[in-house]
Curated annotation (Swiss-Prot):
InterPro entries: ATP_synth_OSCP/delta_N_sf (IPR026015), ATPase_OSCP/d_CS (IPR020781), ATPase_OSCP/dsu (IPR000711). This is ATP synthase subunit delta. Keywords: ATP synthesis, Cell inner membrane, Cell membrane, CF(1), Hydrogen ion transport, Ion transport, Membrane, Transport. F-type ATPases have 2 components, F(1) - the catalytic core - and F(0) - the membrane proton channel. F(1) has five subunits: alpha(3), beta(3), gamma(1), delta(1), epsilon(1). F(0) has three main subunits: a(1), b(2) and c(10-14). The alpha and beta chains form an alternating ring which encloses part of the gamma chain. F(1) is attached to F(0) by a central stalk formed by the gamma and epsilon chains, while a peripheral stalk is formed by the delta and b chains. F(1)F(0) ATP synthase produces ATP from ADP in the presence of a proton or sodium gradient. F-type ATPases consist of two structural domains, F(1) containing the extramembraneous catalytic core and F(0) containing the membrane proton channel, linked together by a central stalk and a peripheral stalk. During catalysis, ATP synthesis in the catalytic domain of F(1) is coupled via a rotary mechanism of the central stalk subunits to proton translocation. This protein is part of the stalk that links CF(0) to CF(1). It either transmits conformational changes from CF(0) to CF(1) or is implicated in proton conduction. It is a peripheral membrane protein. Belongs to the ATPase delta chain family.
């Protein structure tokens, strides 16, 4: 987790509350995603760490974003620039996404496997996890050859390790004790 999460959280909460109030959550997430990508640009990163006046910086940032930001998105950029916080935009986006997922009762579940899983396998995992967590599930699939075979499922603090690597590690622990 980034060191800027504490700084980013109030901006994300304000943006999320505004977006919910104005029924524009998807639009706000898109604006924040675009603005976060702009901060990752090498030239923009240089400007963000430079000594530009906040007003000049916000004008430059808004000009680069162009039509991607509506008036309210531009206002957020201005406030963040005044407080020298534009560099935390990626963390604002991350926090916004977490707030959205929590409000929509969606659990993010990470599935790690040695090989690409079929659509049928993914559907079975989604079904089982939705039943177990009592909420909708969004899968984030990763491939890690060190798993060897089987899968590892992570949802918050819960970890289900059905991998060959996990079994071998547990067997090694038993043999050593």
């Amino acid at each position: 987790m980034s060191e800027f999460v504490t700084v980013a959280r109030p901006y994300a909460k304000a943006a999320f509350d505004f977006a919910v109030e104005h029924n524009s959550v998807e639009r706000w997430q898109d604006m924040l995603a675009f603005a976060a990508e702009v901060t990752k640009n090498d030239q923009m990163a240089e400007l963000l760490s430079g000594a530009l006046a906040p007003e000049t910086l916000s004008e430059a940032f808004i000009a680069i974003c162009g039509e991607q930001l509506d008036e309210n998105g531009q206002n957020l950029i201005k406030v963040m620039a005044e407080n020298n916080r534009l560099k935390v935009l990626p963390d604002v986006l991350e926090q916004f996404i977490h707030l959205r997922a929590a409000s929509e009762a969606i659990a993010e579940v990470e599935v790690i496997s040695a090989n690409q899983l079929s659509d049928e396998q993914l559907a079975r995992i989604v079904s089982a996890m939705e039943k177990r967590l009592s909420r909708k599930v969004k899968l984030n699939c990763k491939i890690d050859k060190s798993v060897m075979a089987g899968i590892i499922i992570r949802a918050g603090d819960m970890v289900i390790d059905g991998s060959v690597r996990g079994r071998l590690d547990r067997l090694a622990d038993v043999l050593q004790s």
